[in-house]
Each structure stands twice: as structure tokens, then as C-alpha cells.
Regions:
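Non-catalytic alpha-helical scaffolds and adjoining flexible linkers that form interface surfaces
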Residues: 1-35, 40-211
């Protein structure tokens, strides 16, 4: 093996061993004693990892691998399976921080997790989105039911921007003309921002979305 190739492989092993900031988005059974985790990490995006032995009664991971709990995880791969999409969970510990959503606030929290699972590709880092997700969980934990909707809508917009789905909101999508103060516009799922004949309330809504 050439020296550069050996250096690259050594660097890859070092990167794999570095702790990652992570949240558990979802898990499902892998075997009688193990789980497959869907993780959202700050450094490497969405990943899948096998947590061997996590279902055993005395496993230290049972109280750690919980949704909405910020973790520090260490991942690896088997030596003969370097290209596998599913990683091995080498270790996980609670990272501390803000309170987790509980009770009725679990429902909007799981909604955020579902958005990330459906819209994020694997191994595609979005550190700013990770931070926005952590902030949204903090807000949900502190808010009552009336306060959930602003948190969810703000996160949806951030997610659409990060994934490149949200159109430019300062212009009419079809004509690329700038939005004019006092005019009314609507945001259509397939057409983007469109001029509207409705009242001025829609215009102010678009302005708030742009903000």
C-alpha cells in the first residue's frame, strides 16, 4: 500500500472514531438483543447505526438511546465492511443540555423527526439545521400547545431552505419580478410565489415568511 493511501485510510479511521453530536430520530429491532438507530449528527448528517446488545436488560445504552436527548456517539465499521451504509455504534453517552419535550409535546417532536427522516439524504451534513432542531426541541419543551405551531412552521422553513426546496421568496417565481409592497401574493406548492388577487393579508404573510 502506498504511503498516501495508508495516510488516507488512517485518517478515515481517526474520523470514524471521533465523537459526534447526535440525536436518535428512530429505532427498530435488528435482533433479539440489538437495535438499528436512525441518527441525526451535526458533523455527518443522517446516519444508520447498529447498537449491539442495546435491548439487553442491563445494557447501559437502554437509558441513553432515547429520542430528543442530545448524545455524544462514537461510530465505526467492521474492518471488512468499510463501504457499508450501516455503521456500528461503538459508544454513546448523554451530552446534557436543555430539557427534552415530554407529555403532549412528544407529538410535535416526533413530527420533526419524521420530517428529517423523509427529507434528509444520508451522509449529508447540515450543522445549521442540527442546531435549529436542537433549538426547536428546547422551545417545544417549554411551550404549551398554543406555542407549538410557530416553532414547527419556523423549523419547516429552515428545513426547506437547507435542502434547497424552498423557492426564492423575494421574487415572483415565474417572472422573477421583485415583490412589491402593498401587493398580495400566495405561496403555491408547485408554482412557488405567485401574484394574488386576494386581500393584502396574504402580502403581509409572504413578508413574514421572507423574514
Amino acid at each position: 500500500m502506498s504511503a498516501p493511501a495508508a495516510a488516507r485510510r488512517a485518517g478515515a479511521r481517526h474520523a470514524a472514531a471521533a465523537p459526534l453530536a447526535a440525536y436518535v430520530l428512530h429505532h427498530y429491532d435488528w435482533s433479539e438483543s440489538s437495535l438499528v438507530l436512525e441518527l441525526f449528527t451535526r458533523e455527518r448528517g443522517r446516519l444508520a447505526a447498529v447498537a449491539k446488545g442495546a435491548k439487553r436488560p442491563y445494557s447501559q445504552l437502554r437509558g441513553v438511546l432515547l429520542p430528543f436527548q442530545r448524545l455524544q456517539v462514537t461510530l465505526g465499521r467492521a474492518a471488512d465492511d468499510a463501504q457499508a451504509e450501516v455503521h456500528l455504534l461503538r459508544g454513546a453517552e448523554w451530552a446534557g443540555g436543555a430539557a427534552m419535550p415530554g407529555g403532549a409535546a412528544l407529538l410535535p417532536g416526533f413530527y420533526l423527526n419524521e420530517l428529517l427522516l423523509r427529507l434528509l439524504a444520508r451522509e449529508d451534513p447540515h450543522p445549521a439545521l442540527f442546531d435549529a432542531y436542537a433549538h426547536a426541541l428546547t422551545l417545544l419543551a417549554a411551550a404549551d400547545e398554543a406555542g407549538w405551531q410557530p416553532v414547527l412552521r419556523a423549523f419547516e422553513l429552515r428545513l426547506l431552505r437547507e435542502t434547497g426546496v424552498l423557492p426564492e421568496l423575494a421574487r415572483v417565481t415565474l417572472t422573477q419580478q421583485p415583490l412589491r409592497a402593498g401587493s398580495a401574493y400566495t405561496l403555491q406548492p408547485e408554482a412557488g410565489v405567485c401574484a394574488s388577487s386576494s386581500g393584502p393579508g396574504i402580502s403581509s404573510s409572504v413578508q413574514s415568511v421572507r423574514a
